[in-house]
Amino acid sequence: MKSNKTMEKKMKMSKCIKGIKETPIDLQFKEATARVVYQQYEDVLLNLALVSFNEQRTVLSTMDGLQKVRNVGNVYVPDPLSKRHMTLQSYDQFTQDLPITLGLCHSDFIFLSTGVNMECVAVCEKTYGNFHVCCIATGGARDNALRMGVDAGNWVENKTQMQLSSGTINIILLTNATLTCGAMARAIMTATEAKSAALQDLGYMSTFLPQVQATGTGTDSMIVVSGVNPDVVVKHTGGHTKMGELIGFTAKTAVTEALKKFDNM
């Protein structure tokens, strides 16, 4: 339990810059700064977990692929905004306009989207030797949990309209180690397995087929951010590796906490 003095200090650190209110997210990971940013977009107040670095980082995103950027984020899109922009065409426009609204360069910022408020964000960090892994997650799975390989999909790209559900499990993984492209891809697999383990431990069942265990939601996404330390290079992030263990532990812990916060599990 955090003391009142700690909470007061956090509140004092909240600030307004050019009309944007920011509340810091405490990280032991010193290579990045993280905060929840509140921003008016059109006539709706949204918020996002924004993680920034001093230099460009190689990142692998399930939304944008392999990129080099200084900023990554997880954006809460409230329902009124979701109804306007969560179709394929209008979402592309949203991804172009939001960085401008935030005062960020579009080419230096990639983000995920969710119907989960960033006030329900969860963080887990773990170290081993010279490895440091940090997971920042949000999660909601009451409305669109599914079991992959069992549940049916109903959206056909370019033919039918897709709407963002109020759930979604989004993960941002940070590490100080320089990850190869293969290690970043395997990290997504490792963290996804950990996410499914969190759902299993919490007893989530498919929303559409309640008799089967859920493995995720239909809109989950992830960003993996590589470190830049040339002396700490990691090629393998599977479950038998120490780096894989750190990724799995932090992802499972953060996702579990995030789901408890938003879904009251």
Functional labels for PLM-detected ranges:
Residues K2, M7-M265:
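Alpha/propeptide regions of enzymes that mature by internal proteolysis
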